[in-house]
A protein has these predicted regions:
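ER/Golgi luminal nucleotide-sugar-dependent glycosyltransferases, focusing on the catalytic module
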Residues: 2-294
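Hydrophobic, well-ordered beta-alpha structural blocks that scaffold small-molecule cofactor pockets
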Residues: 283-394
């Protein structure tokens, strides 16, 4: 009875999907077609954005699922693609007419369970937006952006449009890591700063999505594998064999969708070696979560409330994440700070200063890795009002 009610509720929602696709040769693999076939069951209309080019067969395949096909230069990754779509391709009245918007891309295999079942389960969560996986590291938390669903309040209030318009230049010119900051963390920070609630299909998960896909799948129930897990710098046959064995024995997902991609791209034959169940249990038991920052988000936000003028120490990935996720709480961002006298002039459009050139008693968030933070601590901790993401002993 309850399942029938849930299905009815899900089916009554007017939902559009926005799919971002990239493949260097424009080839549309079978796993992509499977994903689109699954999504067809849950969306009323599908828009497809292609970064780069499509081969003829790829175009024919995508046209089976949508004639709303937008091909653009391959710049800015998926964040740039969505920004381009909202700013240049779609009428704002059309996009705000939907009850829900799903943005997703082709950077993963799966889902290995029914997409309809995922939407039915998440219909029980009274949240404004959700995704597959929420990563909680005390600060700079976020929902991974390869599959995001935005509900009515966000859609009708045109929040996505405003975000992508405001950050269009950064997103369309971003490197991969800048995209992770400006799109993934930035959009999450923007929405949560405005009071929108969020949820995720997988709860309490801090395992590395690239190096521990088996733990994410078997222990946490994450129904996808990121394509990058097959890259040579991340590839572990024993880890992936655990995933593949789980998929074969526990799901209806066709493992050949992954095998065929692997054989085409890497020109290697994928041969599953049976994994001993005790070894799997031990591997899952001993998996180490991603380390968390020592500072709490409450303490970070209190620091921002109590201090108007803020510098962020660093001009790398962590500093970018802090800026994009918490910029809405910063009254006056003075710029980024680095140790080197020879440095870039600007980062995300903001000034970059040598630490020796900023006034004494400046308010600084030290957004560096633990070792680098320890190296700079003695030089700044007695001169400035500082907040470190990690506990540092002086």
């Amino acid at each position: 009875m309850l399942l029938g009610i849930l299905k009815s509720m899900v089916n009554e929602i007017k939902r559009a999907g926005i799919f971002c696709f990239y493949e260097k040769d424009g080839i549309v693999d079978d796993f992509v077609e499977y994903l689109l076939q699954e999504m067809e069951k849950c969306v009323d209309k599908l828009y497809i954005i292609v970064n780069g080019e499509l081969c003829d067969s790829g175009r024919n395949k995508l046209n089976k699922y949508s004639h709303n096909l937008y091909i653009r230069n391959n710049v800015g990754f998926d964040g740039g693609a969505y920004a381009d779509f909202f700013v240049n391709y779609i009428d704002i009245e059309e996009i705000s007419s939907w009850d829900e918007l799903v943005i997703f891309n082709d950077t993963f295999f799966g889902p290995i369970i029914s997409v309809e079942n995922i939407f039915e389960k998440m219909s029980l969560n009274d949240v404004d937006f959700w995704g597959m996986r929420y990563v909680d590291r005390n600060v700079c938390n976020y929902i991974e952006s390869y599959f995001l669903v935005f509900r009515s309040d966000i859609v009708k209030n045109r929040e996505l449009y405003y975000y992508f318009v405001d950050n269009y230049i950064y997103l369309c010119n971003a490197t991969y890591r800048e995209t992770c900051s400006a799109f993934e963390r930035g959009l999450f920070g923007y929405l949560t700063s405005k009071g929108y609630s969020f949820g995720s299909f997988v709860k309490d998960n801090r395992y590395d999505i690239f190096f521990e896909p088996d733990v994410n799948m078997v222990k946490c129930g994450l129904p996808i594998i990121k394509k990058k897990c097959l890259n040579t710098d991340k590839y572990s046959k024993s880890v992936l064999d655990i995933c593949f064995q789980y998929i074969i024995t526990k799901t209806d997902y066709d493992i050949n969708l992954i095998y065929n991609f692997y054989e085409r791209v890497y020109e290697k034959k994928s041969i599953l070696e049976e994994i001993d169940n005790e070894m799997v249990a031990e591997r899952i038991k001993c998996a180490e979560p991603i380390p968390v920052y020592d500072v709490t988000e409450e303490r970070l936000l209190r620091f921002l409330r109590n201090n108007n003028d803020i510098y962020i120490y660093g001009a790398g990935f962590i500093a970018g994440n802090v800026w994009w996720e918490y910029k809405y709480y910063i009254i006056n961002m003075k710029g980024f700070v680095v140790s080197d006298k020879k440095h870039v002039d600007r980062y995300f459009g903001l000034s970059v200063y040598s630490v020796d050139d900023i006034p004494v008693n400046s308010n600084i968030i030290v957004a560096l890795g633990k070792e680098n933070a320890a190296e700079v601590a003695e030089n700044i901790i007695y001169k400035h009002n500082t907040l470190f993401l990690y506990d540092i002993n002086i």
